[in-house]
Every structure is written in C-alpha cells, then in structure tokens.
UniProtKB/Swiss-Prot annotation:
InterPro entries xref list: PsdUridine_synth_cat_dom_sf (IPR020103), PsdUridine_synth_RsuA/RluA (IPR006145), RluA_PseudoU_synthase (IPR050188)
Annotated source species: Arabidopsis thaliana (Mouse-ear cress)
Name of the protein this chain belongs to: RNA pseudouridine synthase 6, chloroplastic
Alphabetized PANTHER family for the sequence: MITOCHONDRIAL RNA PSEUDOURIDINE SYNTHASE (PTHR21600), PSEUDOURIDINE SYNTHASE RSUA_RLUA-LIKE DOMAIN-CONTAINING PROTEIN (PTHR21600:SF52)
Catalytic residues identified in the record: D261
Annotated transit peptide: 1-66
Length: 472
C-alpha cells in the first residue's frame, strides 16, 4: 500500500545518502526470549554498530559502514537457493532522517547488505514501513526513547502532509515495502527482517498434485504439512498461496481466506478475486462454513462436545481451562467418531518427519473425526492435550500433557484448579512454569488433517475432501 511517504518512481536519487539512526538491532534467541508478532522482545547486538549511532556522510557523500564480515554477521549474497536451516533472527529497526530516500538503496548502505539481497528481502515481504515510528518497547534505551520523542513530537508531525487526517496510531500502522523503487520521507520508520524464516518444504512438493478443485471464484488446496497458508511476517514468498498460484499459472496471485496451522495438512480455500475473498470471510464470520478434521490422538476421546476456555493472549502455547475465566474465550469441538488404530510405525513417522515427543505407549493411536464448532488458533491441539489425548507428533503440547499426567498440579488451570487458591505472584510463577512445560512448534507435521470443508452459495452446496492422511 503506497502513501505520500513511500512512493514508487524510476528516477535517480540526487539527494545524498540519508542520515540514519538505529532504533534497535534485534537478535531474538529462543527459548530465552519469547515474543509475539505485535510486541517483540528487543536486545541490542554488541557486534553491530552502536544503537542510535549517527552515521554521517563525508564531503563526498560516502557513508562509512562496517562490513558484514567485520561485524560478525553472516556473509550475505542472495536469499536463493533456499537453505535447509534458518539463521538466527535479526531484525533491524530504523528511522529515516531525510526526505526523498530510495528505500532499497538506503537499507543496502546502512546495513551493509548487497543490493540484490535487499531486493530479495523486499520480494519476500521482509521489509516493513510506517509513516510514524511506533513506540519503542519497555527494554528501549534512553537514547532510543529520545530519538522516538524527537521524530514523533507534535511540532514535527504537524509539518508532515502525509499524515494529515490520520491519528498518530493510524500513522504508526506498518505496511510492506513492495517494490525496490519506493521512496521514503523523513520520519519514516523501517523494519527489516534480515534473516526471514525459510520454508524449504515448499520446494519438495508437487503442488499441482495437491490441487483439489479450481473454479472461477476459488481454488481448493490439499495443504501439505510443514507449510504456511499465506506466509509469515517476514516471508510471503515461500507459502501455499504463492506456490499454488505458480503451479496453476494464474494471472493474479491467490488470496488467503482462512488459516490452518503450519503443521496441519488438508483443505484450504483460496479466493481468486478480492470480491470472493470478502464473500468467504463473511461466511466464516457467520459460521456458514463447516470444517471437519481427522485427528490422530495418543489416547481415546469421548464422543460428544468438549468445551474449554482459552486465554486471550495471542501467543503460543495457547492455554485452556475447563472452567470459565473472565475474559477467556469459549472453545468447543465435537468428537463425532473415535476409533482405535495401530500407532504409525517408525518408518512412516520418519518419512513424514513426525517427531517423537516422549509418549511411552505406542501400540495404538486413536483416529477421531472432529467437528470444529469454534475456530481458535491451536484449538484442537490445545483441547485434546488438556484431555490427556495430545496429537501424535505435537512437540508443543504433548510434553505438557505428559507432565500433567505425571503431576496434575503442574497445570494451574487443570483438574487441580490451583489458580483458585493462589496469590497473584504465585499464579504468575505457576503459569510461567506451565508454559515452560510446553515444547517448540513441530518442524513439519502432526496427527491433524482438515479433511472436509463445505458451505452453501447461491449456486448450491460446495463440498470438498482432502486426500488420505499421512498415517494411513
């Protein structure tokens, strides 16, 4: 989305390279730092130029910068071919201090990155901007706070025509930089995900074979496990939407209408037009879309409706409680069928990259058909784990379920209901310890498939099924 502060144009940059101040050089390491996409935890890198250092141009308009190799960072070339591993996250936050700055050139010079690498980052959707700098996190240094106050002071903002008619909060909303020829004005905030999270699985899949249906309005994809539906904050290139669009040689890229977890396989609906995208979103809001799932659980589940309440924090793991807690969201699913089947053998698990999460009894598993009544993130995974029947291969929720089976007091929201009798500080400690019992997100797949999706339109019923799940 373009704005007067960030526009495209094929003209030479005549102004000198802009002055730059770095808000923060972020290197987030897990599991020491937990973050969500709205409020990441920040630490300043000691190997990069000092935070908030003012990089000045000399008389020849040349900026002095340390090279990536000298700074201790990875040596950069191109984002392709896709590596089999991810580099540690590196997120750079910057504020432009001069007008008429070519964003791609600015990033290349200030972060000492090859121009082609920056072009790749922009193509991947890893570069974001806001007209006004967002508020720094609580971990910001005094110098960072001073810079923020300088570039967002009312006397400065009232002179910027690009934000007239907008509230400060509206002007702080971030958008993607979509072209290498976009320009920025003074005061523009830039966030660069230098090491986007990669998805090598995308290059291993025969995408045409995963297409279930193609109509004038939408496409149904049997999504492979280990892929994202529409991409991530730092990578929209390596996604189901992009690769399915290419497989079908479509003139316009497919549009995301709903999500399923990366580790889940099965039916996903992509809209071919903005109009149908809006139509399908409305159907989802009105609960007119029916979704059935096949779940491979480690223990049996009762037939019928299972209800929990989910903590409203938008971060994993998702915590659920059996009893209603003020502000928590009701989650309901209906188990329609639960049948005992052999646990997948080691060769099958290895073939599909299913992780061994420590479940001891592996003679039988339980294939359940589930009608999802509410559509919360991680809902089936979190609810089944809370029932003592985590999904096979779920490296995030199965370790916590195992811990609770060994000691019910481990879960402050479980059957022991410890949170009722705790002081506030004790509760916070217990919740933090319970979160730590959970593991990392699965690398590829788990025992979960979106097996059916259906809805009605003016032209009748639309009903689609996914293929055979990996465990059969």
């Amino acid at each position: 989305m373009a704005s007067p502060a960030l526009t495209g144009g094929y003209r030479n940059l005549t102004a000198p390279v802009s002055l730059l101040r770095t808000l923060a050089s972020t290197r987030v390491t897990t599991p020491l730092f937990r973050s969500n996409k709205h409020s990441p935890r920040f630490i300043s890198s000691p190997k990069r130029f000092t935070c908030l250092s003012l990089l000045k141009t000399d008389s020849q308009n040349q900026t002095t910068l340390s090279s990536s190799s000298n700074s201790g960072y990875h040596e950069y070339n191109r984002l392709m071919p896709c590596p089999a591993y991810n580099l540690p996250p590196r997120i750079e936050h910057m504020v432009v201090l001069e007008d008429d700055v070519l964003v791609s050139e600015f990033i290349s010079k200030q972060l000492d990155l090859p121009p082609l690498y920056v072009a790749d980052l922009i193509r991947f959707g890893a570069v974001h901007y806001a007209l006004v700098c967002p508020k720094p996190p609580p971990t910001a240094t005094p110098e960072e706070i001073i810079l923020f106050e300088e570039v967002t002071s009312p006397s400065v903002l009232k002179k910027r025509s690009s934000i007239k008619g907008k509230t400060v909060r509206e002007a702080q909303k971030t958008f993607r930089v979509t072209h290498t020829n976009q320009y920025a004005e003074a005061g523009t905030y830039l966030r660069v995900h230098v090491h986007p999270k990669r998805s090598p699985r995308c290059y291993e899949i025969d995408w045409k074979s995963r297409i279930v249906a193609v109509t004038d309005s939408y496409v149904i994809l049997d999504k492979p496990a280990g892929t994202t539906v529409g991409g991530t904050t730092d990578n929209i290139e390596e996604s189901c939407a992009t690769f399915a669009s290419r497989a079908l040689d479509l003139p316009e890229p497919l549009k995301t209408t709903h999500q399923i977890d990366n580790c889940t396989e099965g039916c996903v609906v992509f809209a071919r037009t903005k109009e149908y995208c809006s139509v399908f979103h409305t159907k989802i809001r009105n609960k007119e879309v029916k979704k059935l799932y096949r779940a491979l659980a480690a223990a049996p589940l009762p037939i019928g409706i299972i209800s929990h309440y989910m903590r409203p924090k938008n971060m994993a793991p998702r915590l659920v409680a059996e009893d209603s807690i003020q502000g928590w969201h009701l989650c309901q699913l209906e188990v329609l069928e639960c049948k005992k089947i052999p646990w997948p053998d080691a060769a099958t698990e290895k073939k599909h990259d299913i992780e061994d999460c420590g479940w001891t009894s592996k003679e039988f598993a339980y294939e359940c058909t589930i009608n999802l009544l509410t559509g919360k993130t991680h809902q089936i995974r979190a609810q089944l784990a809370a029932c003592g029947a985590p999904l096979v291969g779920d490296s995030m929720y199965m370790p916590a379920a195992i811990a609770e089976m060994g000691n019910p007091d481990t879960n402050p929201y479980g059957k022991a209901k410890k949170h009722y009798t705790m002081e506030e500080n004790q509760k916070e400690t217990a919740v933090a310890e319970w979160i730590d019992r959970h593991g990392k997100e699965p690398r590829v797949g788990i025992g979960l498939q979106a097996c059916q999706i259906s809805w009605d339109d003016d032209d009748g019923e639309h009903f689609y099924e996914a293929g055979t799940p990996w465990w059969r």
